[in-house]
Regions:
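Domain-edge interaction signal
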Residues: 1-145
């Protein structure tokens, strides 16, 4: 399991390397769906921190705060560190490409679909800021098709 910072840096670096830098909003959604997909593939969590239900979908607050200075603009940071195990890189890279190609607002719409973990927790705003349990995330079926 990796810290949210480690995974965020990996995504930012990878997206930059393919000429498709991401915004904070897009980063958050890619991280969320990677957590879902990683659990499905490996039966273990990719990211140790919890996601919270915010207006525009699942968010890890510490990551949001790290990149909030960019607003809706693309993140320009680059990182030298890379602690992601080689055994997972092909899986992560393929899924980051897949998710990034959808664009941030499609990813937001996917997290907002009726019945998703975000939808259940956010509850029309009554659950704004509440933690989306890892048990709910493990059951997310958004990306099955």
């Amino acid at each position: 399991m990796y810290s949210a910072v480690q995974v965020a840096r990996y995504i930012i670096n990878f997206c930059y390397s393919i000429g498709r830098p991401v915004s904070n909003l897009e980063l958050q959604k890619i991280m969320y769906f990677l957590q879902v997909l990683f659990w499905r593939a490996y039966k273990k969590e990719l990211i140790e921190e919890e996601f919270c239900a915010w207006r525009y979908g699942p968010v890890i607050p510490v990551i949001y705060n790290m990149y909030s200075g960019y607003g809706g603009n693309l993140i320009k940071n680059r990182y030298a560190d890379n602690v992601i195990d080689d055994n997972y890189r092909d899986f992560l890279n393929a899924n980051i490409r897949r998710l990034e190609s959808k664009g941030p607002w499609t990813l937001v719409d996917m997290t907002h679909a009726q019945g998703t973990p975000w939808y259940q927790v956010y509850d029309n705003g009554y659950g704004d800021g509440y933690i989306i349990s890892k048990e709910l995330i493990k059951k997310d079926t958004t990306l099955i098709n």
